[in-house]
Amino acid sequence: MKQLVCTASLLLLIGCQSTDPDIRAMTKPDFADAAPPAIDSQTSSTRDIRFATYNTSLYSDDDGGLVRRLENDDASARKIAAVIQHQRPDVLLLNEFDYDANGMAADIFLKQYLGRSQDGQEAIFYPYHYIAPVNTGVQSGMDLDNNGKIGGDGRDRGNDAFGYGLHPGQYGMLVLSQFPIDLDKTRTFRNLLWKDLPGAMKPKNPATSQDWYKPADWARLRLSSKSHWDVAIETPKGIVHFLVSHPTPPVFDGPEDRNGARNHDEIKLWSEYLDNKNTQWLCDDKNICGGLPSDARFVIAGDMNSDPVDGDGVPGTMLQLLDHPRVSKYAAPRSDGAA
């Protein structure tokens, strides 16, 4: 079944508690100022449903830093909340929102920022949200940048993580929803190995024509720099699979272009997920294998760090999704400078 549309780098393609303590889908949070109003759209099957994606840059270089920022009336967070209150999407992906295992940052942002009027906008309440661990900042124990040492300080430490980051959870993701989230149908692919992707773009060292990664490292390297999530949203029109990710920028490397190759393959993963052919390799973090059923409705969203025309990415990277037969073909919203 074909679904939504797209922009370039920031992409939108439309086509309770977990048993895992690190994964949370909150329901009806205890709002600070007022009880959330009734959501008429939950009982209406005729109303349009609005999905959105937003890179918030709500991150800190320090572990727990975002929680401390939000606890101290952060000006940037208030401005971001005002934008969300003005646009009022039903389902929203926030990229670059630091993950913490207790969900404190998400709770504070929901209650103290979205749940209170910002810049004259009406407060907005999301009864459901989803957070889960990401690969950024999780040390791999490998010398992934080939500088002769494992870990270190600053960027050296970040480069040797499974996804670039200075602490686990940096640059994470957060999904907000007006509708319930079905955790049994929700999937994550944080641990999927890059080597298992068919036709993976294995980086080469151009100076030696040898593989950039040592064989033992390539065998352990994860594909997703943050994570890939299939979040099952129970809308009045039925389940919609919210396919969200934040591929690594195709820069900050060297002539081997290891980040360009990874960006290409992180985006390719969604193309393979939509194809759903010969997917015995495509196993989620619960070890359930397979792609998206052909009759499933979906939205693909995220900061893809890729453009079909410009930029530093591998040519054709975004076309893997834009030209996919399951993706709807109609004009995406646009504005000068994507503002």
Residue positions per predicted region:
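Short, solvent-exposed loop/turn segments at secondary-structure junctions
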Residues: 58-59, 99, 136, 181, ...
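N-terminal, active-site-proximal structural segment of metallo-dependent hydrolase catalytic domains
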Residues: 17-175, 202-220, 236-240, 255, ...
